[in-house]
């Protein structure tokens, strides 16, 4: 199982803002945001935040957008603003760094990190962006780069499909593309691992770890995950949500091993 080569992105579809979360990537990511909002608070001095947003999505005009977090399992609105002529603004005091969700009604649009500084948010039918503060810059730079790598992998897969449809020998196709696919897969794994390791001590480390793990069909240990955990400091390993994932993953691995042993015994 290639842990980090799974397609994850934050690119909206044209009608998404009207009816649903903006991307297949948003669902697992927002699920992670819910967890992180509940427990990943980093103490800081009380400082002011400023969110300035622009939207080219006409259906948003007149709608109210919310910054929401979880408090004891319930949604709490941290701030809100009405979109007027494609613009919205929120300002307030922040006492801790926390992941929040920009929402319209009950639908999550995109994750944001609420921290001291001025954050610029762009909403369109093509892309979602958040820049202007250190952690948001880092998060969306990661998302952009990860999407670029995923697009390259998709193109290789499309090329493989085209060659098959053209009637070329499958073994020849595999030989032609295997090296390139393996190299790109390793690049993706390395990029994600290095990003998490570089952010072990802040909200991005466990946030991105859970984000990529949430794309897996179920919690499981892989060589990539083992490598991240093996070099992680105690603060990362002791994060409640990382610990919960690892406990479930190791339990699943034991179940899988038991199933394999039972199947082998039955055959013998």
Predicted regions and their residues:
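Soluble oligomerization/assembly scaffold segments of membrane-associated complexes
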Residues: 137-141, 191, 196-203
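Short, local alpha-helical segments
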Residues: 174-175, 189-193, 207-214
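Charged, long alpha-helical assembly modules
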Residues: 197-200, 204-268
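A non-transmembrane, solvent-exposed segment enriched in polar/low-complexity residues
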Residues: 45-189
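Bacterial Sec-dependent N-terminal signal peptides
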Residues: 1-54
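Charge-rich, solvent-exposed alpha-helical interaction surfaces
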Residues: 176, 180, 187, 191, ...
């Amino acid at each position: 199982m290639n842990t980090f080569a799974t397609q994850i992105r934050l690119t909206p579809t044209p009608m998404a803002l009207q009816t649903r979360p903006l991307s297949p990537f948003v669902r697992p990511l927002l699920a992670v945001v819910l967890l992180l909002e509940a427990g990943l608070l980093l103490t800081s001095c009380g400082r002011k935040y400023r969110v300035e947003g622009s939207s080219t999505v006409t259906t948003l005009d007149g709608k109210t957008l919310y910054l929401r977090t979880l408090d004891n399992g319930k949604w709490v609105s941290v701030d809100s603003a009405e979109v007027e002529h494609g613009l919205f603004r929120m300002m307030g005091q922040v006492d801790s760094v926390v992941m929040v969700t920009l929402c319209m009604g009950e639908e999550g649009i995109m994750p944001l990190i609420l921290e001291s500084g001025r954050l610029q948010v762009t909403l369109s039918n093509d892309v979602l962006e958040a820049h202007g503060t250190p952690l948001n810059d880092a998060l969306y730079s990661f998302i952009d780069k990860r999407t670029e790598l995923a697009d390259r992998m998709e193109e290789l897969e499309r090329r493989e499909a085209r060659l098959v449809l053209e009637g070329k020998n499958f073994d020849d196709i595999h030989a032609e593309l295997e090296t390139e696919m393996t190299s790109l897969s390793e690049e993706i794994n390395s990029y994600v691992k290095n990003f998490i390791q570089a952010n072990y001590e802040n909200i991005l480390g466990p946030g991105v770890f859970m984000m990529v793990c949430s794309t897996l069909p179920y919690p499981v240990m892989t060589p990539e995950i083992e490598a991240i955990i093996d070099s992680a400091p105690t603060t990362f390993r002791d994060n409640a949500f990382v610990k919960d994932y690892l406990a479930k993953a190791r339990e699943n691995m034991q179940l899988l091993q038991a199933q394999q042993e039972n199947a082998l015994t039955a055959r013998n």
